[in-house]
């Protein structure tokens, strides 16, 4: 497994395959190709009114690619109900290399100077592959996800791959689709010349955020641990 390179990772993602480690200390990586694939439809995200008010209040400030390594470390931290992680040191090194060449990105959410939430993932043409997210304050990861979706829409991305479905994601509009349908969406996305936005702030994305759906009477799932 020592021959895994950033280029090999990108070729794997282009085929719908992604790696995970069995635990934080392992040097081994396994490749995954789920039969049901989680996606967040970029035209069908559900943003409840309470979450929209939080996002639009500007109480939490959002940036991109300011603290990639710190976000990865935070995503790998133990949390209630999750004592182990698939984000090993080797994973962090590989994705750090992808970040330095412009193919992996982070979204950071802060209250004041404190990093309270965020996410990271891989971008490849018109597809963004979400890897992991974290929250240290309630709804911080949801704020990151709303800004991510708004930014991807602005940059003309067509696919947000979440790998699997979770209550947290389905509560915001995430769905699971068959592998064949996913491959079709992926193939289409790889023909698109999307652009990763330079600015993920509320000021830059206000119009795109405001266009997201706000379903009446919908109660979202809570933040993941």
From Swiss-Prot:
Signal peptide: none annotated. The keyword Cell cycle does not apply. InterPro entries: Acyl_CoA_acyltransferase, Leu/Phe-tRNA_Trfase, Leu/Phe-tRNA_Trfase_C. GO terms for biological process: protein catabolic process. Its EC number is 2.3.2.6. One of its GO terms (molecular function) is leucyl-tRNA--protein transferase activity. The keyword Cytoplasm applies. Its main location: cytoplasm. It is found in: Cytoplasm. One of its GO terms (cellular component) is cytoplasm. It catalyses: N-terminal L-lysyl-[protein] + L-leucyl-tRNA(Leu) = N-terminal L-leucyl-L-lysyl-[protein] + tRNA(Leu) + H(+); N-terminal L-arginyl-[protein] + L-leucyl-tRNA(Leu) = N-terminal L-leucyl-L-arginyl-[protein] + tRNA(Leu) + H(+); L-phenylalanyl-tRNA(Phe) + an N-terminal L-alpha-aminoacyl-[protein] = an N-terminal L-phenylalanyl-L-alpha-aminoacyl-[protein] + tRNA(Phe). Keywords: Acyltransferase, Cytoplasm, Transferase. Transmembrane segments: none annotated. Belongs to the L/F-transferase family. PANTHER family: LEUCYL/PHENYLALANYL-TRNA--PROTEIN TRANSFERASE, LEUCYL_PHENYLALANYL-TRNA--PROTEIN TRANSFERASE. Functions in the N-end rule pathway of protein degradation where it conjugates Leu, Phe and, less efficiently, Met from aminoacyl-tRNAs to the N-termini of proteins containing an N-terminal arginine or lysine. HAMAP family: Leu_Phe_trans. This is Leucyl/phenylalanyl-tRNA--protein transferase.
């Amino acid at each position: 497994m020592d021959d895994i390179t950033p280029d090999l990772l990108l070729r794997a993602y282009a085929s719908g395959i992604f790696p995970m480690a069995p635990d934080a200390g392992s040097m081994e990586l396994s490749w995954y190709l789920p039969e049901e694939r989680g996606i967040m439809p970029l035209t069908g995200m559900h943003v409840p009114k309470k979450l929209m008010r939080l996002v639009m209040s500007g109480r939490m400030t959002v940036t991109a690619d300011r603290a990639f390594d710190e976000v990865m470390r935070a995503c790998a931290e133990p949390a209630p109900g999750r004592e182990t992680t698939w984000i090993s040191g080797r994973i962090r090194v590989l994705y750090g290399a992808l970040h330095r060449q412009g193919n992996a990105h982070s979204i950071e959410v802060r209250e004041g100077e404190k990093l309270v939430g965020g996410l990271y993932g891989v971008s490849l043409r018109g597809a963004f592959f979400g890897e992991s997210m974290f929250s240290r304050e309630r709804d911080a990861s949801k704020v990151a996800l709303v800004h991510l979706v708004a930014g991807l829409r602005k940059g003309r991305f067509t696919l947000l791959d979440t790998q699997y479905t979770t209550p947290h994601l389905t509560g915001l509009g995430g769905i699971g689709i068959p592998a064949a349908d996913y491959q079709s969406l992926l193939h289409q996305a790889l023909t698109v010349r999307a652009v990763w936005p330079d600015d993920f702030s509320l000021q830059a994305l206000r119009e795109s955020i405001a266009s997201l759906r706000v379903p009446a009477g919908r109660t979202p799932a809570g933040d993941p641990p």
